Curated annotation (Swiss-Prot):
This is Probable DNA-directed RNA polymerase subunit delta. The gene is rpoE. GO terms for cellular component: DNA-directed RNA polymerase complex. One of its GO terms (biological process) is DNA-templated transcription. GO terms for molecular function: DNA-directed RNA polymerase activity. The lineage of its organism: Bacteria, Bacillati, Bacillota, Bacilli, Bacillales. RNAP is composed of a core of 2 alpha, a beta and a beta' subunits. The core is associated with a delta subunit and one of several sigma factors.
Length: 176
């Protein structure tokens, strides 16, 4: 059955990934992702909001389903259309080539190398602003000196002691 013969009910019931396979098989050529989605919208008479969640799932399925191949520029085709050599060529990462610098290039003052930061941009930023505190604040040392550790008393709550004793007694009951 051709994709154009689908009814709205069939479009509602069928997954977008299966419809995309049928559509690409019918057309026999690669299609842009957005054109595929527009085709589905027209078939099912959908608004964008109505199929938004289905489109998200469709894109995930399109990337994971082995029947499809992204041939670049958001163009999708069927993997069956391509030989193994074609697939490797289409999906192989491209390597960006750089020129090797010679002695003359290294002396060029106007040449900017990759990874070099422009130091001039940071000249107007002060090392410390007025609203920042210094790490070695003398007031902090004064506070530490004012605390006498021998004056600190830790009071134990009697209720907590009673509960601990009860827990200990309960454990002895289990051993007996």
């Amino acid at each position: 059955m051709k994709i154009q013969d689908y009814t709205k009910q069939m479009v509602d019931e069928k997954s977008f990934i299966d419809m995309a396979y049928t559509l690409l098989n019918d057309k026999g050529e690669t299609m842009n992702l957005y054109d595929i989605i527009d085709e589905f919208r027209a078939l099912g008479d959908y608004e964008y909001e109505e199929i938004e969640t289905r489109v998200v799932q469709f894109y995930t399925d399109l990337n994971t389903d082995g029947r499809f191949l992204n041939v670049g520029e958001n163009l999708w085709g069927l993997r069956d259309w391509y030989s193994v050599d074609d697939i490797e060529e289409k999906i192989a990462p491209t390597i960006q080539k750089f020129d090797v610098l010679d002695a003359d290039d290294e002396e060029d003052q106007n040449l900017k190398l990759l990874g070099e930061d422009e130091m001039d941009d940071d000249d107007d930023i002060p090392a410390q602003t007025d609203d920042q505190e210094e790490l070695n604040d003398p007031e902090d040392e004064q506070v530490e000196e004012e605390i006498n550790h021998s004056d600190i008393v830790i009071e134990e709550d009697e209720d907590e002691l009673d509960e601990d004793e009860e827990d200990f007694e309960d454990e002895e009951d289990f051993k007996a």
